[in-house]
Amino acid sequence: MNNLNSVFDYEDIQLIPNKCVINSRSEADTSVKLGNYTFKLPVVPANMQTIIDDKIAEMLAKEGYFYIMHRFEAENRAAFIKKMHKDGLIASISVGVKADEHAFIREISAEALIPEFITIDIAHGHADSVIKTIQLIKRLMPQTFVIAGNVGTPEAVRELENAGADATKVGIGPGKVCITKVKTGFGTGGWQLAAVKWCAKAASKPVIADGGIRTHGDVAKSIRMGATMVMVGSLFAAHEESPGQTVERDGQLFKEYFGSASEYQKGEHKNVEGKKILLPHKGSLKDTLKEMEEDLQSSISYAGGRDLSALTKVDYVVVKNSIWNGDAI
């Protein structure tokens, strides 16, 4: 492993500007290629029940954004693939690693319901069960782009890539509603950005940074450290379109946001590694996506380039938790 004394996270880093070469930030190209497809932004909403549902998945696909449908309504997945393909849209689903999930993979393969993207989605992705699932998907559906995770070490990235994964998802418990670090003592919470850097250096295929994104600038920082795509949870939660339940408190509207390993998602208090919080009700998800695109265009202009590749070359400084100068975000 790399030098474990030089870890850092998003709030510890500032990117250093270069000379601007475009006349307007609107000239900057934020598009990214993943597999055989090009998407409008290097950002994907987290595949969580309070972030994405069928309607949001359809909207994102139609608008040219990448999405990953969650796996918590397993019985609807085959119908979801059918509908997306019928509408001429890409199908991107999540699977687990247990026997019933392997049966599902065999079933959709036999029915020629082949999704363009499958994400193998478990909390600790450096596991034999994940490797077996990658190998099964690649044997039955070689053309499907397989994302595997979640992991937090270069060794894990290499092993999943060697098993056939087309991309790896990096992040163990840094998310806002994830309490893995508290419950288990393990994870990338507090050093997620360093983990992204280390894992991306070891990777020969795309890395998706997952968790710990609190501001739009964190997307640019993730790309600087080697991420191709950035998974975002809390920033995409609590919108008008979001599936979470709306709650009124003291005249203000909030929406529920809970983790994928919380008792609220699992329906039982067993092996809980997530919690539920209320977030202030936000406006339209489309507005947030547009704002994120504009902020990323500004990042590209500060990087002195015309597209996302400029962000991968900028210098940065480590300022250890001081970039807010005492201000709240």
Curated annotation (Swiss-Prot):
GO terms for biological process: 'de novo' pyrimidine nucleobase biosynthetic process; purine nucleotide metabolic process. GO terms for molecular function: GMP reductase activity; oxidoreductase activity, acting on the CH-CH group of donors. InterPro entries: Aldolase_TIM (IPR013785), Dihydroorotate_DH_CS (IPR001295), GMP_reductase (IPR050139), GuaC_type_2 (IPR005994), IMP_DH/GMP_Rdtase_CS (IPR015875), IMP_DH_GMPRt (IPR001093). CDD domains: IMPDH. Keywords: NADP, Oxidoreductase. NADP(+) binds at residues 207-230. It catalyses: IMP + NH4(+) + NADP(+) = GMP + NADPH + 2 H(+). GO terms for cellular component: cytosol; GMP reductase complex. The active site is at C178 (thioimidate intermediate). Its EC number is 1.7.1.7. Gene3D superfamilies: Aldolase class I. Coiled coil: none annotated. It comes from the Bacteria. Catalyzes the irreversible NADPH-dependent deamination of GMP to IMP. It functions in the conversion of nucleobase, nucleoside and nucleotide derivatives of G to A nucleotides, and in maintaining the intracellular balance of A and G nucleotides. Belongs to the IMPDH/GMPR family. GuaC type 2 subfamily. PANTHER family: GMP REDUCTASE. This is GMP reductase. It comes from Lactococcus lactis subsp. cremoris (strain MG1363).
